[in-house]
Amino acid sequence: MLFRCKCDMMNTLQKLPFPGMNAGKRSEIKGRNPMNLLILTSIILSVILGVSRMVDLALFTDAETGLCVVGSVWLRYAALAVAILLAVAAGRAAKPEARKLCSPCKPSGVMAVLGAGFMAATFVAKLALWDSSVVGRIIMAFLSLSCSAWLLALGRSWMSKSWKRPSDDLTHVVLGTAVFYWCVLARFMENSSSWHRVAPTVVVWQMLAALVFLSVLGRALSLPDTADSRTLCASGLTVWALCLCWEFPQLLDTLLRGGVLARLPDFFFGLGLCCIGVLGGICAVRTTRTESGRKSARHSVG
């Protein structure tokens, strides 16, 4: 009986709200700023979009023409519209802070360096493989190289122990994103198609999304006081949806069908887009999260 009373007393003491411990727990919980639910929903929905795209390419799309053989083409556009609208809404509704990107971050740096490598591979492949459009090939090659240099500068900034601005002005940003301007123009000049072929149409959306994201990102890193944080977050989620979740299934389908060598420059460029998509998702999460509250909790307990 006495032993039971002692156990009950110990349990009661453990549950008492001691000031130091309770304040620490409150500080820790408050310091943990979980990912915005809308942003998390957008990321998950984009992944579902990618899985659906993989199934669509494997079963419901003609491999030769790119035309839909089962279901309406407008169902594909509707799914894309939902993913894009949710990404934009999540980014605009959140309270991101672009300044949080001005600090070392190894995942961001790795993705930027990988993207730079694939863009450099696009440059080499464009010059090595001969095609009929000599002028367009050369322009695309050197613009890809410029984009590679810009992404490499971003990667070095994020992977260095002490943060350094990748550029003090926006000249490098303009040169680094010019390839996406060119891709939009080339899509209409060289390979225009009807709305019934989803992939060529969505390429334009991908280029515009990457252009907006990298432009706003470059401004946020070079001129933090003039950054548009909400546009940065929204465009980051959009490139996650379009440049990663939509593009990767198409690259995987090309790889499985054995068409990589015939489209090697486009394949490398697509891999670069995927890296930009991952980078967009990382940046969107970083701008909306705060550091863990463990340090503040430790100080309050002490």
Residue ranges and their predicted role:
Residues L2-T12, P17, M21-E28:
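Short, positively charged and aromatic/hydrophobic N-terminal segments
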Residues E28-R137:
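N-terminal topogenic module of multi-pass integral membrane proteins
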Residues I39-L57, L85-V88, V203-G302:
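C-terminal transmembrane-bundle signature of multipass membrane proteins
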Residues S42-S52, S108-A125, M140-A153, D169-R187, ...:
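Alpha-helical transmembrane segments of multi-pass integral membrane proteins
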Residues M54-A63, F123-S132, V184-W195, E247-G258:
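Juxtamembrane "helix-exit" motif on the non-cytosolic side of transmembrane helices
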Residues C68-I84, S108-A112, T122-K126, V134-W150, ...:
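Alpha-helical transmembrane segments of polytopic membrane proteins
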Residues A83-R99, A149-M159, L211-A220:
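Canonical alpha-helical transmembrane segments
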Residues P96-K106, S157-L170, L221-R230:
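Membrane-interface helix-boundary motifs at transmembrane edges
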